[in-house]
Amino acid sequence: MFSRYSSWEALPAAWRENKRQSAEWLLMRIQRHRTTKEPNEPFRILSIGSGIGYMEKLLLDAMPDLELYVNEPSTVGLKWLRSYLPADRVFIGFPPLCLPPDVSFDMIYISAVDYSIATRDFLFLLEALRAQLLPGGELICLSSSYLQEDSYIGSFVNAIKIVIRAVLHYLGVRPQQFWGWRRTRREYQQLFKQAGLTVEEDGWLEKTAETYWIVGR
């Protein structure tokens, strides 16, 4: 990708606009949450699966004093973002194993990566991240792989997905090589509750109806 694009600004405009809307929504929540802290108290936030870091760059542009930490499995993806952050705020690897157990956060968000995580592993991740929240902290999931529930299409897609996974499993092929995990609103709420989180609220980004969000404490 980096051989094709020279900077964030060179990326497709539609993709950047989608990320910008998500970042603006996060900024709104951060600003609201910061009012509960002392003026000089740092606000510590962790991004899980930052990718190439465009949303994080937008957050830092808007709030230069934000104590932002990022996680990404690959060192390559953060090539552009590294100049924005101290080295000790970058965690490379798979969470929660790569995260320092002695650091807690006011907010942790997972954006558009949960589709790549099997349900059992996603539950384990939510439980581990909940343990790293400061009192009153928020755990947020932004999902662009949301599956409409109570619809014929949604039920049909789920049924086909189950059949394909069974066939691939029988053939000895790991299904996550080809298919992600799409979840309904009810499934997200259930996973958050199973992880010991209280679901504060959930909904859809106003300008991007396909992006679902859920907040737990």
What role is predicted for each listed range?
Residues 112-116:
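Short catalytic micro-motifs in class I SAM-dependent methyltransferases
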Residues 1-37, 41-43, 47-100, 140-217:
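Class I (Rossmann-like) S-adenosyl-L-methionine-dependent methyltransferase catalytic domain
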Residues 123-135:
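A short glycine-rich, Lys/Arg-flanked "PGG" loop and its adjoining helix->strand segment in the class I
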Residues 118-120:
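Short N-terminal helix/helix-N-cap motif within the alpha/beta-hydrolase-1
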Residues 109:
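A conserved beta-strand element that flanks and buttresses the S-adenosyl-L-methionine
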